[in-house]
């Protein structure tokens, strides 16, 4: 991959998919260029939200949350989350997750099913 930023993003997506698989979720990285953007990580379980993965030095939380809301609709999911790499932390288990409060409550209450 010639673009270092794309390579960085792809590596972060693979790391998240691998971590979710280790945790017992069937997760796969969605190839770039799909006609309908459903997010970066696909988990067949409909109760799981759409997932957007970010590895950027500059945060754009509002923009990312807006984007993942569109991806959630495209994926047929009620909600979406953004997983973003934490500086200095290679293990996705310690990365951040961003979503709206409404999304958080929906996930906690299990209404995403």
Regions found by a protein language model. Give the residues of each.
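Catalytic phosphate/metal-binding cores of nucleic-acid and nucleotide-processing enzymes, i.e., regions
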Residues: 1-113
């Amino acid at each position: 991959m010639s673009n270092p930023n794309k390579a960085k993003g792809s590596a972060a997506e693979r790391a998240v998919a691998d971590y979710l698989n280790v945790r017992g979720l069937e997760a796969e990285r969605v190839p770039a260029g799909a006609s309908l953007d459903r997010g970066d990580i696909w988990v067949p379980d409909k109760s799981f939200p759409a997932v957007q993965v970010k590895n950027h030095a500059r945060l754009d939380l509002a923009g990312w949350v807006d984007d993942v809301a569109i991806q959630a609709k495209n994926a047929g999911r009620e909600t979406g989350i953004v997983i973003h790499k934490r500086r200095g932390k290679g293990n996705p288990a310690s990365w951040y997750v961003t979503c709206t409060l409404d999304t958080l409550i929906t996930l906690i209450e299990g209404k995403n099913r």
